[in-house]
């Protein structure tokens, strides 16, 4: 029910946000927590070939010793798109040239008789909320893939230290079905079984692509043609280098990084195009044109074609009038 031209009354937006959106978000965060911080989901024990050179790379150390540690990665992934969206929305709202189009796309929502939700607040919550949901969803997909496949890292045999004396491992092509012959540190071995897909690659490309889609869809720069491309390509390049770092440190295979890039790209494209609709506002339904009165419009109209008989008759009539005069 419309109250004014730019105000719309809604009694369902707040209950839907509390009892649907927040519940789904809480369930997603909880599932990501169980994957990340508990042993609820056991990793598949995968076998390996004896003396496999692809699994005997040097141990690069713990994840905290990596050039891009998990703490730094998660902070940058969460903060960068959030800051871009927050600054971008506030800037567009207070700039006169973009504020008019923003207000035209988003209506002021009146909930009940007292509470107003401005277009600025709705857009910030929508875009950042969808980004956070996608970030946790990508983490769930990655952990599920690692648990199901149990793909071994390039340094697996280095930390596994398998007991070959208890197996028939005379040939290099001998496959060991029993993956429980490792004698190394169990915690390190557990992490060495979680290689596919690469979590760093999936999360970094998701965050970078989501931010890039927001920049290209909402931010308008008439004075500079290269500002947006440089910012977007720089963001995507950072994600690409993050994946390459995983390969250079022997923490993931090339196939793991590629799969992570594909996964993160798919999630970002789906949310950006199908959920937030390329970061466009929810425009009101355009007013339908008033239908014409059917009584004043003919059912079918044809172009008038002059008959040859009428032409000949007119000529004869003209000739007869000439003779009379």
UniProtKB/Swiss-Prot annotation:
Mode of membrane association: Multi-pass membrane protein
SUPFAM superfamilies, sorted: Acid phosphatase/Vanadium-dependent haloperoxidase
Cysteine disulfide links: none
UniProt GO BP: nervous system development; phospholipid metabolic process
Keyword Transmembrane: yes
Transmembrane segments: 13-33, 67-87, 127-147, 201-218, 230-247, 257-277
Modification Phosphoserine, positions: 307
Glycosylation sites (chain numbering): 5, 163, 316
Family affiliation: Belongs to the PA-phosphatase related phosphoesterase family.
Protein name listed in UniProt: Phospholipid phosphatase-related protein type 1
């Amino acid at each position: 029910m419309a109250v004014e031209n730019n105000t719309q009354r809604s009694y369902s937006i707040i209950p839907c946000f509390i009892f649907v959106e927040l519940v789904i978000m809480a369930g997603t965060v909880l599932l990501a927590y169980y994957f990340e911080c508990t042993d609820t989901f056991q990793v598949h024990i995968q076998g390996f070939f004896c003396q496999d050179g692809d699994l005997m790379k040097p141990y690069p150390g713990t994840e905290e010793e990596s050039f891009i540690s998990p703490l730094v990665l998660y902070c940058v992934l969460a903060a960068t798109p959030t800051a871009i969206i927050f600054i971008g929305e506030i800037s567009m709202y207070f700039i006169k040239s973009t504020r008019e189009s923003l207000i035209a796309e988003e209506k002021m929502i009146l909930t009940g008789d007292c509470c107003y939700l401005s277009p600025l607040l709705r857009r910030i919550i929508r875009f950042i909320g969808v980004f956070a949901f996608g970030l946790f969803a990508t983490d769930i997909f990655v952990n599920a893939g690692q648990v199901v496949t149990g793909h071994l890292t390039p340094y697996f045999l280095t930390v596994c230290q398998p007991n070959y004396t208890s197996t028939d491992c005379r040939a290099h092509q001998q496959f060991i079905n029993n993956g429980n012959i490792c004698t190394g540190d169990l915690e390190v071995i557990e992490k060495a079984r979680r290689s596919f897909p690469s979590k760093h690659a999936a999360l970094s490309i998701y965050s970078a692509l989501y931010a890039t889609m927001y920049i290209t869809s909402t931010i308008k720069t008439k004075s500079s043609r290269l500002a947006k491309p440089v910012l977007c390509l720089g963001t995507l390049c950072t994600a690409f280098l993050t994946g390459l770092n995983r390969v250079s440190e022997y923490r993931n295979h090339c196939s793991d990084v590629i799969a992570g890039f594909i996964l993160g790209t798919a999630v970002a494209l789906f949310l950006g195009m199908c959920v937030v609709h390329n970061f466009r506002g929810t425009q009101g339904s355009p007013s339908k044109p008033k239908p014409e009165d059917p009584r004043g419009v003919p059912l079918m109209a044809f172009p008038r074609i002059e008959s040859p008989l009428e032409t000949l008759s007119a000529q004869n009539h003209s000739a007869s009038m000439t003779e009379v005069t």
